[in-house]
Each structure stands twice: as structure tokens, then as C-alpha cells.
Amino acid sequence: MTDQELMDMAKKAAEYAYVPYSKFPVGAALECSDGTVFTGCNVDNAAYGDTICAERTAAVKAVSSGHRDFVRIAIWGNSKEYCYPCGSCRQFLQEFSKHMTVLCARSDGSFVSHKLSEMMPFFFDF
């Protein structure tokens, strides 16, 4: 699967976002080492702290299906700026793959690629 195909899946996932408060739909497509892809969208909540990001939605779907070896994640947000994962998502993802590729898009379709370890070189670990 190409980076663009994975990003297209992330953009499609954003269509399902529940964002009555933030008005900021985000979609993610997470690829596992065996090629399986899990998508996720962000889900707002009136208690803002209970909101869940698209990246963690996709990761929880993967883990709850028995997948724990992540290779790439594509993140699409409806913004003129690149949609980077928040600190909580970076910490959450590194639990499963410190060196995975993170593709961050903006609404015009362009995207950049980083290694998770570059985006969060110091993370909490036991």
C-alpha cells in the first residue's frame, strides 16, 4: 500500500468524526506489520477531557483485534496546517512502535513524513 492510499483511508475515516464541539474532523489509518489497516476518527465529548483522538481510536481498534506491531499511521485533518498527533497520541503510539512512520496531512492533500522517535525523542517508559 502506498503512502497516498493510506492517507486516502485516513481522509475517508474523518468523514465519520463526531465533532460537535471542536468542529475539527480528523481521520487516521494505522498499518500493522502484517499489512492490516485500522482506521479511526476523533470523537468529541461535552466533557472535553473525555474526547478521543483519531490516532488512539485506530490504535485501540488494532490492539483489541490482536495487533501490536505498528508500521505507519496516516493522519488527515481539515486544516491548512499539517495535522500532527498530540502528545498523548505520540506517547500512546510509542508503546507499540517507537520507530513507526507518521504521515501528517493538511486539507490540500499534501503530507509530510516523520519517524515517531523524531517527533517524541523522550517518552515515558518504565
Report the location of each language-model feature:
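Polybasic, low-complexity association/targeting segments
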Residues: M1, F38-T39
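C-terminal binding/interaction regions
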Residues: T2-V19, S65-F126
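Active-site segments that bind and position negatively charged phosphate/pyrophosphate groups
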Residues: S22
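Short beta-strand scaffold segments in enzyme catalytic cores
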Residues: P25-C32
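Hydrophobic "anchor" residues
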Residues: T36-V37, F111
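Compact, glycine-rich, soluble single-domain proteins
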Residues: C41-T57
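Feature captures the catalytic cores and cofactor-binding loops of soluble hydro-lyases/lyases
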Residues: T57, K61-S65
